[in-house]
Curated annotation (Swiss-Prot):
Native organism: Synechocystis sp. (strain ATCC 27184 / PCC 6803 / Kazusa)
One protein family per Pfam: DUF2555
InterPro entries cross-referenced by the UniProt entry: DUF2555
Protein's name in the database: Uncharacterized protein ssl0461
Length: 83
């Protein structure tokens, strides 16, 4: 199960499960912008395709916050008070 959408560098063709720190380090701002644009457009053939992109952006946010910071709103992370 891998994302087959290629960026200009081809880095975003991997699945989230196979994403290594070296892969994330190789991503460019353009790669992440393309990923964010797909999420923003929300024009996927099925729900799982969008979910894979969401998880990919989330993984990038954990490892390269500088690249994901402009797109954190797409992750819709909210702090919940579970007390």
């Amino acid at each position: 199960m891998s994302c087959r959408r290629l960026s200009t560098s081809g880095v975003l063709s991997m699945s989230v499960q196979n994403l290594s720190k070296q892969d994330v380090a190789a991503l460019t701002a353009e790669d992440v912008a393309q990923l964010a644009q797909r999420l923003e457009n929300d024009d996927y053939t099925d729900a799982f395709e969008g979910l894979r992109d969401w998880h990919l952006l989330r993984a990038i946010a954990f490892q390269r916050e500088d690249l994901a910071e402009p797109y954190l709103y797409l992750l819709d992370n909210e702090t919940y008070d579970e007390a």
